[in-house]
Design a protein with these regions (language model features):
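Conserved glycine-rich Rossmann-like NAD(P)H-binding loop of the short-chain dehydrogenase/reductase
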Residues: 51-63
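C-terminal substrate-binding subdomain of Rossmann-fold SDR/epimerase-dehydratase oxidoreductases
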Residues: 1-2, 227-343
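Conserved Rossmann-fold NAD(P)-dependent oxidoreductase catalytic core, especially the SDR/UDP-sugar
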Residues: 99, 125-170
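N-terminal Rossmann NAD(P)H-binding glycine-rich loop of SDR-like oxidoreductase domains
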Residues: 30-48
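Non-catalytic terminal and boundary segments that flank Rossmann-like NAD(P)-dependent oxidoreductase
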Residues: 1-29
Length: 343
């Protein structure tokens, strides 16, 4: 379990401290997509508080037991096997809802575009329907992808609108996330649902799934194995990245302190780097090298064509939140924790 490692325990404690989530005491938080990169860390953080009830859902009970099974003995924790494309049971209630269930890696966009689109749209709708019934607050986890492609050197503020190529396989993810955000605002306007949106940059960390095909995850996986880091492009793309601990802390901070019907970018300007620099950092930490290779056609179809995707985080910083980790620190911690778990 991740919680066995002292650095991960420190990360979880950092997330609880930075997020300032004392007002969650005695409340129930529902998290869908509980076994994913963010879901695992989020649940570990909520359970660390000691006075928050957590309902976690996912499609695989076996995966849940393997990744968040340390909480099963707690009376404050419950896991329910559930498909996010289906409505929630009428008996379910919660004070806060965080619908994380989503396909978030390129191979899924290429091989399962229909499922990628439907889980984003239907998952958001069913979460919002539950919020109407329970008078719950929704924190919707969105993505930098909703901005489309930047014009020149532009940085994405929350009101930015870029261009998007609908003819690519990847549009199943970006357009369905845009639709889900529109649903959030529609439910806020029509039904009075309290909803805040967290637009995440590219998130990485030790809780990533072994099947994750994002470039950053592949770099880190190979680093943990002591292998050379394979870069399948020139690596000149400039992106915002966020360590998973900072992402979880920011999400909870937005949920508790953000304004209703408002979107907040989650990024860390210390982690705005080119893809080749991320690869080199992973190689340096692992004592290996960066090598270049060509992607397969299936891989290429799911790749982002964006050359620049930098999130402006000033709106988030104005709420008092501050990220904690540099790129080097985050990569080192990820490799350290994953190396321990491989033993």
């Amino acid at each position: 379990m991740f919680t066995d490692h002292p650095s991960y325990k420190a990360d979880v404690q950092r997330a609880t401290d930075v997020a300032d989530i004392g007002r969650l005491s005695g409340k129930t938080v529902l998290v869908t997509g509980a076994t994913g990169l963010i879901g695992v860390h989020l649940i570990d953080t909520l359970m660390q508080l000691g006075n928050v009830n957590v309902i976690a859902t996912g499609r695989s009970a076996a995966s849940a037991r393997a990744r968040i099974g340390s909480h099963y003995a707690s009376p404050r924790f419950r896991f329910a096997e559930h498909d996010a494309c289906l409505p929630f049971d009428e008996s379910l209630t919660a004070d806060y809802i965080i619908p994380l269930a989503s396909n978030t890696h390129p191979l899924a966009y290429s091989q399962h575009p229909v499922e990628t689109a439907t889980v984003n749209v239907l998952g958001a709708k069913h979460a919002l329907d539950l919020a109407v019934r329970c008078h719950a607050t929704v924190l919707y986890p969105s993505t930098v992808e909703v901005y489309g492609n930047a014009r020149g050197e532009d940085v994405f503020t929350e009101d930015y609108t870029g261009t998007l190529n609908l003819s690519t396989a990847r549009s199943c993810y970006t357009e369905s996330k845009r639709c889900a955000e529109a649903l959030c605002l529609s439910y806020a306007a029509q039904y009075g649902v309290e909803v805040k949106t967290a637009r995440l940059s590219r998130v990485f960390g030790p809780t990533m799934l072994p099947t994750d095909t994002k470039a950053s995850s592949q770099f880190l996986t190979r680093a943990v194995r002591g292998e050379d880091i394979v870069l399948k492009s020139e690596g000149t793309q400039l992106y915002s990245y966020t360590y998973v601990t900072d992402a979880v802390a920011a999400m909870l901070h937005i949920m508790m302190h953000g304004e209703n019907a408002t979107a907040y970018n989650i990024s860390n300007r210390e982690c705005d780097v080119r893809l080749k620099d991320f690869a080199q950092t992973a190689a340096d930490c692992a004592g290996t090298h960066v090598v270049f290779d060509l992607p397969t056609e299936t891989e290429r179809r799911g790749y982002s064509i964006a050359q620049r995707a930098i999130l402006d985080n000033r709106r988030l910083l104005a709420t008092g939140f501050r990220p904690a980790y540099t790129m080097r620190e985050a990569v080192e911690r990820t490799i350290e924790i994953l190396s321990y778990l491989r033993k």
